[in-house]
Amino acid sequence: MPHPYPALTPEQKKELSDIAHRIVAPGKGILAADESTGSIAKRLQSIGTENTEENRRFYRQLLLTADDRVNPCIGGVILFHETLYQKADDGRPFPQVIKSKGGVVGIKVDKGVVPLAGTNGETTTQGLDGLSERCAQYKKDGADFAKWRCVLKIGEHTPSALAIMENANVLARYASICQQNGIVPIVEPEILPDGDHDLKRCQYVTEKVLAAVYKALSDHHVYLEGTLLKPNMVTPGHACTQKFSNEEIAMATVTALRRTVPPAVTGVTFLSGGQSEEEASINLNAINKCPLLKPWALTFSYGRALQASALKAWGGKKENLKAAQEEYIKRALANSLACQGKYTPSGQSGAAASESLFISNHAY
């Protein structure tokens, strides 16, 4: 029989489990502010703002220093490497700012998607080289969890068995390396919403992908209580002509998770996948109201679905700081309610609340 070497000690396991529970405590979710320099460039460009280090710092500071109303809503913040080492105007490093508000600091550790030879345009994710050393350093610098994104696409012949297996294995290797360094891995196998497939097809593919991911995590001796899953919601493809209700999306999503995700997993933090801000909140709420047994915390790890209205309200102008923070706070409060199944759509939406945030073939 296989034995895990080196095994995690009971102390290491407790630390990992405690961190995971803090991130997804009731009413809390994750702010994904880990856009790479290239991705944040597109966001800044959309508001006519130059992609300088100072503008990136100022914008992240705007989010991280929103007033204490967000404290009960945000359990963790995922940062990009650069942001982890930036400081607020008052001289405090951003990790300190996040911790002072009760949040856990996270770091994106993958190095982006690369083509997977032998497939029809499918990808794997790079960044395992030197990952252990980077994790050790990030832990010293205040990060307690990490994120790694793999991408799968639904097509007539995709995802292929090869792409599913390769991505599941790379996620498992990453997760194992994180845990050896005291960092909770967020496992993100994103199935893109591109395509004209219906809800059933997305559910089927999601089940196959998640089953492969948890088999790989078991093979690599990953301690599930010290992990979080960041999956897509089960939705029809963006080009699907058939409409499905929020309840149908919720039922398909929870069913897929119940069939594949062990109850030992601490929490599921959904990605928003280009849904509008309002849609992402409504679907999360429906998922939490779904009348099936759900043994994990079901919450959010949203990027654009927490930031779109705030970004628009800021518009690159310092004097719009407060207005932008109000928009961010509004979404944080909405999603905090949604992850408890208590959200009622207000209709008084933000600057971009109902705009689709879909970007085809989305690469961070």
Swiss-Prot record:
EC number in record: 4.1.2.13
SUPFAM superfamilies to which the protein is assigned, alphabetical: Aldolase
Positions of modified residues (Phosphoserine): S36, S39, S46, S132, S272
Active site: residue positions: E188 (proton acceptor), K230 (schiff-base intermediate with dihydroxyacetone-p)
Annotated pathway: Carbohydrate degradation; glycolysis; D-glyceraldehyde 3-phosphate and glycerone phosphate from D-glucose: step 4/4
Site of covalent link Glycyl lysine isopeptide (Lys-Gly) (interchain with G-Cter in SUMO1): K42
Modified residues (N6-acetyllysine): K42, K108, K111, K330
PTM sites of type N6-malonyllysine: K111, K312
Modified residues (N6-(2-hydroxyisobutyryl)lysine): K99, K147
Localisation per UniProt entry: Cytoplasm, Myofibril, Sarcomere, I band; Cytoplasm, Myofibril, Sarcomere, M line
Positions of modified residues (Phosphotyrosine): Y5
Annotated crosslink Glycyl lysine isopeptide (Lys-Gly) (interchain with G-Cter in SUMO2) location: K42
UniProt-listed GO biological process terms: canonical glycolysis; glycolytic process; glycolytic process through fructose-6-phosphate; positive regulation of cell migration; protein homotetramerization
MF annotations from Gene Ontology: fructose-bisphosphate aldolase activity; protease binding
Keyword annotations from UniProtKB, A to Z: Acetylation, Cytoplasm, Glycolysis, Hydroxylation, Isopeptide bond, Lyase, Phosphoprotein, Schiff base, Ubl conjugation
Record-level GO cellular component terms: cytoplasm; cytosol; extracellular space; M band; membrane; myelin sheath; plasma membrane; protein-containing complex
Enzyme kind, highest EC tier: lyase
PROSITE patterns cross-referenced by the UniProt entry: ALDOLASE_CLASS_I (PS00158)
Pfam families: Glycolytic
Modified residues (Phosphothreonine): T9
Other facts noted in the record for this chain: In vertebrates, three forms of this ubiquitous glycolytic enzyme are found, aldolase A in muscle, aldolase B in liver and aldolase C in brain.
Role summary: Catalyzes the reversible conversion of beta-D-fructose 1,6-bisphosphate (FBP) into two triose phosphate and plays a key role in glycolysis and gluconeogenesis. In addition, may also function as scaffolding protein.
Family: Belongs to the class I fructose-bisphosphate aldolase family.
Protein name: Fructose-bisphosphate aldolase A
Species whose genome carries this gene: Mus musculus (Mouse)
Chain's gene name: Aldoa
